[in-house]
Protein backbone atom coordinates (compact mmCIF):
# COMPACT_ATOMS: atom_id res chain seq x y z
CA UNK A 1 0.00 0.00 0.00
CA UNK A 2 1.29 3.46 -0.88
CA UNK A 3 1.61 5.62 2.26
CA UNK A 4 3.37 8.72 0.98
CA UNK A 5 1.98 12.15 1.78
CA UNK A 6 0.60 14.01 -1.23
CA UNK A 7 1.26 17.71 -1.63
CA UNK A 8 -0.64 20.59 -3.22
CA UNK A 9 -0.40 20.79 -6.99
CA UNK A 10 -0.22 17.06 -7.64
CA UNK A 11 -3.81 16.33 -8.65
CA UNK A 12 -3.72 14.16 -11.77
CA UNK A 13 -6.83 13.18 -13.69
CA UNK A 14 -6.61 10.28 -16.12
CA UNK A 15 -9.41 10.18 -18.68
CA UNK A 16 -9.90 6.58 -19.79
CA UNK A 17 -8.87 3.25 -18.30
CA UNK A 18 -7.64 1.38 -21.35
CA UNK A 19 -4.11 0.09 -21.78
CA UNK A 20 -2.45 3.50 -21.97
CA UNK A 21 -4.59 5.32 -19.42
CA UNK A 22 -4.37 2.60 -16.79
CA UNK A 23 -0.59 2.32 -17.15
CA UNK A 24 -0.20 6.10 -16.94
CA UNK A 25 -2.31 6.21 -13.78
CA UNK A 26 -0.32 3.45 -12.10
CA UNK A 27 3.03 5.07 -12.91
CA UNK A 28 1.91 8.58 -11.94
CA UNK A 29 0.57 7.35 -8.59
CA UNK A 30 4.14 6.94 -7.35
CA UNK A 31 4.08 10.70 -6.75
CA UNK A 32 0.67 12.09 -7.64
CA UNK A 33 -2.85 12.11 -6.24
CA UNK A 34 -4.49 10.22 -9.12
CA UNK A 35 -8.12 9.88 -10.15
CA UNK A 36 -9.22 7.78 -13.12
CA UNK A 37 -12.45 8.74 -14.89
CA UNK A 38 -14.04 5.94 -16.89
CA UNK A 39 -17.67 4.78 -17.03
CA UNK A 40 -16.69 1.10 -16.80
CA UNK A 41 -15.89 -0.72 -13.57
CA UNK A 42 -13.62 -3.13 -15.40
CA UNK A 43 -10.51 -3.02 -17.56
CA UNK A 44 -11.25 -4.84 -20.80
CA UNK A 45 -8.61 -6.61 -22.90
CA UNK A 46 -9.49 -5.01 -26.20
CA UNK A 47 -7.05 -7.21 -28.10
CA UNK A 48 -9.25 -10.22 -27.27
CA UNK A 49 -12.52 -8.88 -28.67
CA UNK A 50 -12.43 -11.33 -31.58
CA UNK A 51 -12.26 -14.13 -29.01
CA UNK A 52 -15.43 -12.84 -27.35
CA UNK A 53 -17.19 -12.90 -30.70
CA UNK A 54 -16.15 -16.54 -31.04
CA UNK A 55 -17.47 -17.49 -27.60
CA UNK A 56 -14.88 -16.57 -24.95
CA UNK A 57 -16.71 -15.81 -21.71
CA UNK A 58 -14.84 -12.83 -20.30
CA UNK A 59 -11.93 -10.52 -21.10
CA UNK A 60 -12.38 -8.07 -18.23
CA UNK A 61 -10.67 -7.44 -14.89
CA UNK A 62 -12.05 -5.30 -12.03
CA UNK A 63 -10.44 -1.86 -12.12
CA UNK A 64 -10.25 -1.96 -8.34
CA UNK A 65 -7.80 -4.87 -8.56
CA UNK A 66 -5.32 -2.51 -10.25
CA UNK A 67 -6.09 0.75 -8.46
CA UNK A 68 -6.53 -0.12 -4.78
CA UNK A 69 -2.92 -0.74 -3.77
CA UNK A 70 -1.87 2.66 -5.07
CA UNK A 71 -4.91 4.43 -3.66
CA UNK A 72 -6.05 5.61 -7.06
CA UNK A 73 -9.64 6.81 -7.08
CA UNK A 74 -12.10 5.76 -9.77
CA UNK A 75 -14.96 7.98 -10.92
CA UNK A 76 -17.52 5.92 -12.83
CA UNK A 77 -18.69 8.58 -15.26
CA UNK A 78 -18.29 9.65 -18.86
CA UNK A 79 -16.23 12.72 -19.73
CA UNK A 80 -18.22 15.34 -21.62
CA UNK A 81 -15.96 18.40 -21.58
CA UNK A 82 -12.53 19.73 -20.66
CA UNK A 83 -12.09 23.32 -19.49
CA UNK A 84 -8.34 23.93 -19.90
CA UNK A 85 -8.58 27.50 -18.59
CA UNK A 86 -10.17 26.54 -15.27
CA UNK A 87 -8.32 23.20 -15.40
CA UNK A 88 -11.47 21.18 -14.86
CA UNK A 89 -13.07 18.13 -16.45
CA UNK A 90 -16.86 17.87 -16.68
CA UNK A 91 -18.59 14.48 -16.55
CA UNK A 92 -22.06 13.38 -17.62
CA UNK A 93 -23.34 13.62 -14.04
CA UNK A 94 -22.56 17.38 -14.25
CA UNK A 95 -19.74 17.16 -11.75
CA UNK A 96 -16.60 19.22 -12.27
CA UNK A 97 -13.24 17.63 -11.47
CA UNK A 98 -10.23 19.93 -10.96
CA UNK A 99 -6.74 18.90 -12.04
CA UNK A 100 -3.16 20.11 -12.02
CA UNK A 101 -2.08 17.69 -14.73
CA UNK A 102 -4.33 15.75 -17.08
CA UNK A 103 -3.83 12.52 -19.02
CA UNK A 104 -6.04 12.19 -22.11
CA UNK A 105 -6.47 8.48 -22.82
CA UNK A 106 -9.88 8.15 -24.46
CA UNK A 107 -8.62 5.78 -27.13
CA UNK A 108 -10.25 5.09 -30.48
CA UNK A 109 -13.22 3.42 -32.10
CA UNK A 110 -13.96 1.62 -35.33
CA UNK A 111 -14.86 4.12 -38.03
CA UNK A 112 -17.91 3.07 -40.03
CA UNK A 113 -20.11 4.69 -42.65
CA UNK A 114 -22.47 7.39 -41.37
CA UNK A 115 -23.65 6.65 -37.85
CA UNK A 116 -22.31 3.08 -38.00
CA UNK A 117 -25.71 1.42 -38.15
CA UNK A 118 -27.84 -0.39 -40.70
CA UNK A 119 -31.61 -0.37 -40.79
CA UNK A 120 -31.73 -4.14 -40.55
CA UNK A 121 -29.22 -4.43 -37.69
CA UNK A 122 -26.65 -6.42 -39.69
CA UNK A 123 -23.61 -4.29 -38.84
CA UNK A 124 -21.25 -5.08 -35.96
CA UNK A 125 -17.74 -4.01 -34.94
CA UNK A 126 -15.08 -5.36 -32.58
CA UNK A 127 -16.48 -3.08 -29.88
CA UNK A 128 -19.87 -4.80 -30.16
CA UNK A 129 -18.40 -8.31 -30.01
CA UNK A 130 -20.81 -9.45 -27.27
CA UNK A 131 -23.83 -8.49 -29.38
CA UNK A 132 -22.23 -10.21 -32.35
CA UNK A 133 -21.86 -13.36 -30.24
CA UNK A 134 -25.58 -13.30 -29.44
CA UNK A 135 -26.43 -12.82 -33.11
CA UNK A 136 -24.27 -15.79 -34.11
CA UNK A 137 -26.06 -17.94 -31.55
CA UNK A 138 -29.35 -17.23 -33.33
CA UNK A 139 -28.43 -19.49 -36.17
CA UNK A 140 -26.15 -20.00 -39.18
CA UNK A 141 -25.96 -17.80 -42.22
CA UNK A 142 -23.44 -15.68 -44.11
CA UNK A 143 -20.99 -13.30 -42.44
CA UNK A 144 -18.67 -10.82 -44.15
CA UNK A 145 -15.71 -9.17 -42.45
CA UNK A 146 -14.84 -5.81 -44.03
CA UNK A 147 -11.20 -4.80 -43.72
CA UNK A 148 -8.05 -6.86 -44.22
CA UNK A 149 -5.88 -5.47 -41.44
CA UNK A 150 -4.87 -7.38 -38.31
CA UNK A 151 -8.24 -6.86 -36.59
CA UNK A 152 -10.17 -8.18 -39.57
CA UNK A 153 -7.84 -11.13 -40.14
CA UNK A 154 -8.05 -12.20 -36.50
CA UNK A 155 -11.84 -11.79 -36.44
CA UNK A 156 -12.41 -13.78 -39.63
CA UNK A 157 -10.05 -16.58 -38.59
CA UNK A 158 -11.46 -16.90 -35.10
CA UNK A 159 -15.06 -17.00 -36.30
CA UNK A 160 -14.36 -19.43 -39.13
CA UNK A 161 -12.69 -21.83 -36.70
CA UNK A 162 -15.41 -21.57 -34.04
CA UNK A 163 -18.50 -21.22 -36.25
CA UNK A 164 -18.30 -23.97 -38.84
CA UNK A 165 -22.00 -23.63 -39.67
CA UNK A 166 -21.52 -20.01 -40.77
CA UNK A 167 -20.14 -19.12 -44.19
CA UNK A 168 -17.39 -16.55 -43.56
CA UNK A 169 -15.96 -14.17 -46.15
CA UNK A 170 -13.72 -11.11 -46.18
CA UNK A 171 -13.83 -8.04 -48.40
CA UNK A 172 -10.93 -5.58 -48.33
CA UNK A 173 -10.16 -2.50 -50.40
CA UNK A 174 -6.48 -3.42 -50.70
CA UNK A 175 -4.45 -6.53 -50.08
CA UNK A 176 -5.11 -8.65 -47.03
CA UNK A 177 -2.47 -7.96 -44.36
CA UNK A 178 -1.17 -4.71 -45.88
CA UNK A 179 1.42 -4.33 -43.11
CA UNK A 180 2.79 -7.84 -43.67
CA UNK A 181 5.54 -9.17 -45.90
CA UNK A 182 4.60 -11.23 -48.94
CA UNK A 183 5.42 -14.35 -46.92
CA UNK A 184 3.06 -13.16 -44.20
CA UNK A 185 0.25 -12.47 -46.65
CA UNK A 186 0.76 -15.86 -48.28
CA UNK A 187 0.33 -17.55 -44.91
CA UNK A 188 -2.85 -15.60 -44.20
CA UNK A 189 -4.32 -16.51 -47.59
CA UNK A 190 -3.38 -20.16 -47.08
CA UNK A 191 -4.99 -20.14 -43.63
CA UNK A 192 -8.15 -18.60 -45.06
CA UNK A 193 -8.36 -21.37 -47.65
CA UNK A 194 -7.92 -24.02 -44.95
CA UNK A 195 -10.66 -22.41 -42.84
CA UNK A 196 -13.02 -22.01 -45.79
CA UNK A 197 -12.93 -18.19 -45.72
CA UNK A 198 -13.73 -16.57 -49.05
CA UNK A 199 -11.38 -13.62 -49.68
CA UNK A 200 -12.04 -10.75 -52.08
CA UNK A 201 -9.18 -8.25 -52.30
CA UNK A 202 -9.17 -4.88 -54.05
CA UNK A 203 -12.87 -4.22 -53.47
CA UNK A 204 -13.96 -1.10 -51.56
CA UNK A 205 -17.36 -1.71 -50.00
CA UNK A 206 -20.14 -0.01 -48.06
CA UNK A 207 -22.56 -2.01 -45.86
CA UNK A 208 -25.42 -1.57 -48.32
CA UNK A 209 -23.27 -3.15 -51.06
CA UNK A 210 -22.91 -6.43 -49.17
CA UNK A 211 -25.34 -9.31 -49.38
CA UNK A 212 -24.61 -10.96 -46.02
CA UNK A 213 -26.69 -11.78 -42.98
CA UNK A 214 -24.02 -10.27 -40.71
CA UNK A 215 -21.35 -7.65 -41.46
CA UNK A 216 -18.36 -7.13 -39.15
CA UNK A 217 -16.72 -3.78 -39.90
CA UNK A 218 -12.99 -3.56 -39.09
CA UNK A 219 -11.81 -1.27 -41.89
CA UNK A 220 -10.32 1.61 -39.88
CA UNK A 221 -9.91 3.22 -36.48
CA UNK A 222 -10.69 6.79 -35.49
CA UNK A 223 -9.28 8.55 -32.43
CA UNK A 224 -11.80 9.63 -29.80
CA UNK A 225 -10.57 13.21 -29.94
CA UNK A 226 -13.81 15.19 -30.24
CA UNK A 227 -13.60 16.35 -26.61
CA UNK A 228 -10.00 17.42 -27.17
CA UNK A 229 -11.00 19.34 -30.28
CA UNK A 230 -13.78 21.15 -28.40
CA UNK A 231 -11.29 22.08 -25.67
CA UNK A 232 -8.98 23.66 -28.23
CA UNK A 233 -6.18 21.09 -28.27
CA UNK A 234 -4.13 21.01 -31.47
CA UNK A 235 -4.99 18.02 -33.68
CA UNK A 236 -3.40 16.46 -36.73
CA UNK A 237 -5.15 16.29 -40.09
CA UNK A 238 -6.30 12.74 -39.33
CA UNK A 239 -7.79 13.76 -35.97
CA UNK A 240 -5.19 12.66 -33.43
CA UNK A 241 -3.81 14.98 -30.77
CA UNK A 242 -0.46 16.60 -31.51
CA UNK A 243 2.10 15.88 -28.78
CA UNK A 244 5.74 16.73 -28.15
CA UNK A 245 8.49 14.18 -27.49
CA UNK A 246 7.46 14.06 -23.81
CA UNK A 247 3.84 13.23 -24.81
CA UNK A 248 2.44 16.62 -23.79
CA UNK A 249 -0.12 18.38 -25.95
CA UNK A 250 1.76 20.90 -28.08
CA UNK A 251 -0.94 23.48 -27.38
CA UNK A 252 -1.61 22.59 -23.71
CA UNK A 253 1.54 21.29 -21.99
CA UNK A 254 -0.30 20.45 -18.77
CA UNK A 255 -2.19 17.76 -20.71
CA UNK A 256 -0.43 14.49 -21.49
CA UNK A 257 -1.85 12.28 -24.23
CA UNK A 258 -1.42 8.50 -24.45
CA UNK A 259 -2.83 5.60 -26.43
CA UNK A 260 -4.59 5.79 -29.78
CA UNK A 261 -5.55 9.46 -29.42
CA UNK A 262 -1.88 10.54 -29.37
CA UNK A 263 -0.03 11.34 -32.59
CA UNK A 264 3.23 10.28 -30.95
CA UNK A 265 6.41 9.66 -32.89
CA UNK A 266 10.03 8.70 -32.33
CA UNK A 267 13.09 8.98 -34.56
CA UNK A 268 13.30 5.19 -34.86
CA UNK A 269 9.63 4.31 -35.37
CA UNK A 270 8.13 7.38 -37.02
CA UNK A 271 4.50 8.11 -36.11
CA UNK A 272 3.18 5.31 -33.93
CA UNK A 273 0.18 3.29 -35.07
CA UNK A 274 -2.89 2.72 -32.92
CA UNK A 275 -2.25 -0.49 -30.98
CA UNK A 276 -1.94 -2.04 -27.55
CA UNK A 277 1.75 -2.46 -28.36
CA UNK A 278 2.16 1.32 -28.48
CA UNK A 279 -0.40 2.30 -25.82
CA UNK A 280 1.41 0.64 -22.91
CA UNK A 281 4.81 2.28 -23.57
CA UNK A 282 3.09 5.65 -24.06
CA UNK A 283 1.24 5.27 -20.77
CA UNK A 284 4.37 4.25 -18.93
CA UNK A 285 6.41 7.17 -20.27
CA UNK A 286 3.67 9.73 -19.58
CA UNK A 287 3.22 8.45 -16.03
CA UNK A 288 6.96 8.56 -15.36
CA UNK A 289 7.17 12.05 -16.85
CA UNK A 290 4.42 13.23 -14.51
CA UNK A 291 6.40 11.86 -11.57
CA UNK A 292 9.52 13.64 -12.83
CA UNK A 293 7.63 16.90 -13.31
CA UNK A 294 6.18 16.78 -9.80
CA UNK A 295 9.63 16.08 -8.37
CA UNK A 296 11.07 19.08 -10.16
CA UNK A 297 13.01 16.99 -12.65
CA UNK A 298 13.06 17.14 -16.42
CA UNK A 299 10.66 14.78 -18.24
CA UNK A 300 12.26 12.41 -20.74
CA UNK A 301 11.30 11.94 -24.38
CA UNK A 302 9.60 8.78 -25.52
CA UNK A 303 11.97 6.07 -26.73
CA UNK A 304 10.28 3.41 -28.82
CA UNK A 305 10.93 1.05 -31.72
CA UNK A 306 9.08 -1.90 -33.21
CA UNK A 307 10.25 -5.52 -33.23
CA UNK A 308 7.39 -7.72 -34.44
CA UNK A 309 3.68 -7.91 -35.17
CA UNK A 310 1.83 -10.88 -33.69
CA UNK A 311 -1.47 -12.17 -35.00
CA UNK A 312 -3.75 -15.05 -34.04
CA UNK A 313 -5.37 -17.08 -36.80
CA UNK A 314 -7.71 -19.05 -34.61
CA UNK A 315 -6.66 -20.89 -31.46
CA UNK A 316 -4.18 -23.25 -33.14
CA UNK A 317 -2.52 -21.06 -35.74
CA UNK A 318 -0.86 -17.68 -35.78
CA UNK A 319 1.65 -15.40 -37.43
CA UNK A 320 4.65 -13.55 -36.04
CA UNK A 321 5.85 -10.97 -38.55
CA UNK A 322 9.28 -9.57 -37.68
CA UNK A 323 9.68 -5.90 -38.52
CA UNK A 324 12.30 -3.20 -38.48
CA UNK A 325 12.42 -0.38 -35.95
CA UNK A 326 10.03 1.58 -38.20
CA UNK A 327 7.46 -1.28 -38.38
CA UNK A 328 8.34 -2.20 -41.96
CA UNK A 329 8.08 -5.98 -42.44
CA UNK A 330 11.15 -8.14 -42.82
CA UNK A 331 11.26 -11.32 -44.86
CA UNK A 332 11.06 -13.39 -41.67
CA UNK A 333 7.97 -14.94 -40.11
CA UNK A 334 6.95 -17.62 -37.62
CA UNK A 335 3.71 -19.47 -38.28
CA UNK A 336 1.49 -22.23 -36.96
CA UNK A 337 0.94 -23.34 -33.39
CA UNK A 338 4.23 -21.85 -32.19
CA UNK A 339 3.12 -18.43 -33.43
CA UNK A 340 -0.28 -18.88 -31.77
CA UNK A 341 1.42 -19.62 -28.45
CA UNK A 342 3.69 -16.60 -28.83
CA UNK A 343 0.68 -14.40 -29.56
CA UNK A 344 -1.06 -15.68 -26.42
CA UNK A 345 2.03 -14.97 -24.32
CA UNK A 346 2.23 -11.42 -25.69
CA UNK A 347 -1.43 -10.81 -24.86
CA UNK A 348 -1.02 -12.21 -21.35
CA UNK A 349 2.08 -10.08 -20.81
CA UNK A 350 0.04 -6.89 -21.23
CA UNK A 351 -2.04 -7.69 -18.16
CA UNK A 352 1.06 -8.90 -16.29
CA UNK A 353 2.79 -5.58 -16.94
CA UNK A 354 -0.21 -3.71 -15.52
CA UNK A 355 -0.26 -6.00 -12.48
CA UNK A 356 3.42 -5.34 -11.87
CA UNK A 357 2.91 -1.59 -12.17
CA UNK A 358 0.05 -1.83 -9.66
CA UNK A 359 2.25 -3.24 -6.88
Describe each model-derived feature in a short phrase.
Residues 1-11, 69-144, 216:
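FAD-binding core/adjacent interface of flavoenzyme oxidoreductases
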Residues 74-82, 97, 162-245, 299:
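A Rossmann-like FAD-binding core segment of flavoenzymes
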Amino acid sequence: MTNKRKTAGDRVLVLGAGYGGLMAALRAADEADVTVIDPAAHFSERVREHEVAAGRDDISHPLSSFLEKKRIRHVAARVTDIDPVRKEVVTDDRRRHPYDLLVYALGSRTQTFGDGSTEDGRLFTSETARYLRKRLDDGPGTLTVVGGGATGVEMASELAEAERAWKISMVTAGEVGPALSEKGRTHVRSTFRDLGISLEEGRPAAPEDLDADVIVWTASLRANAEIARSAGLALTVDGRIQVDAMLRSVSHPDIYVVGDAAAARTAAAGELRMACATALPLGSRAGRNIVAELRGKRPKPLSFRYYAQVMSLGRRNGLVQFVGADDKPKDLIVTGRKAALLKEQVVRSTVRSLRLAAR
